[in-house]
């Protein structure tokens, strides 16, 4: 029995395993960066390829970070009410810093800052954290959970034949479900009634048949 043995060892020490999960989570978030002039741009945004066991192990950490960022979105929207459009260093910005609007903005922004610090503590990458809060979290506002999927790859990894898998965000590469068209029986019934109404009815035909039989 595997009592109190949650998780996978992955052939690493606890500190090495923790660093591995941090790097995988940051790598997935960083694929959503603006890589127009990046020489090492990701081939597909929102997707990384790793081993199957690593993907299963890092998925809960990715989901946890997204949930933390998503819960801070209402506070960020509340803080926008008291924000200023003035550039930093200008006289208007300095006046705003001394006003009560800045105090309200700082109070509304405090939960967002706490959430960002929590995610930085979990993954250790500030750039990935900013991408998570600015881009990824807004995508899953109406989704209660299940932000990622794992797709097994058919070809194993060269060298050790390890099972590979894709870890990606849902919503971008989803298959479109097409519903079959429902057959309409009302049109067929109406056409049959019209055909029966158009057929002529001859009352003398049965009488003629009976007379021929008597002969």
Where are the language model's segments positioned?
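Short alpha-helical functional segments enriched in proximate histidine and acidic residues
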Residues: 27-28
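Intrinsically disordered, low-complexity acidic/polar and Pro/Ser/Thr-rich regulatory regions
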Residues: 196-215
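Structured, basic alpha/beta domains of bacterial-type, RNA-associated proteins
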Residues: 2-8, 19, 31, 43-202
